Regions:
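Active-site helical microenvironments for divalent-metal-assisted chemistry
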Residues: 1-139
Length: 139
């Protein structure tokens, strides 16, 4: 499966959704995608939120022709009900080579304070959580 199809899926899945700053949400996965190197990393980067935030499923992605390697990497960066806490989720991403790179890129973009309209206690807590997660992922 190719990058072009992954972009089409992401654009359609995130259509009409805005981020916390009011920008089209699709700009986030596209930014994550552009910060990665290989085609597989870029595919996972642009699709990293489709299962977590939209009607897409891992099965549907596999049916679209994405390889087990790609679907497993997307799974590694998708929060699930089995995650007892955020550290379980981060450790799962860390254990997948593609997932690790994608999650690092995702967190770095999420830490861009220019995307946040106002920084309060909630945002500071989130930024601290992201900083700790980066330490774990980069260790």
């Amino acid at each position: 499966m190719n990058l072009e199809r992954a972009i089409e899926i992401a654009v359609e899945a995130h259509k009409g959704i805005k981020d916390k700053g009011g920008s089209p949400y699709i700009l986030h996965p596209l930014t994550v995608m552009h910060s990665l190197e290989t085609e597989d990393e870029k595919i996972v980067g642009v699709l990293h939120d489709v299962v977590e935030d939209t009607h897409w499923t891992f099965v549907k992605l596999a049916e679209e022709g994405f390889s087990d390697k790609i679907v497993d990497a997307i799974r590694s960066v998708t929060k699930s009900a089995e995650d007892h806490d955020y550290s379980d989720f981060i450790n799962r991403a860390k254990n997948n080579p593609i997932g690790r790179k994608v999650k690092i890129a995702d967190i770095k973009h999420n830490m861009d304070v220019t995307r946040i309209q106002q920084i309060g206690d909630t945002e500071r807590e989130r930024l601290n959580k992201y900083l700790e997660s980066l330490r774990v992922l980069q260790a």
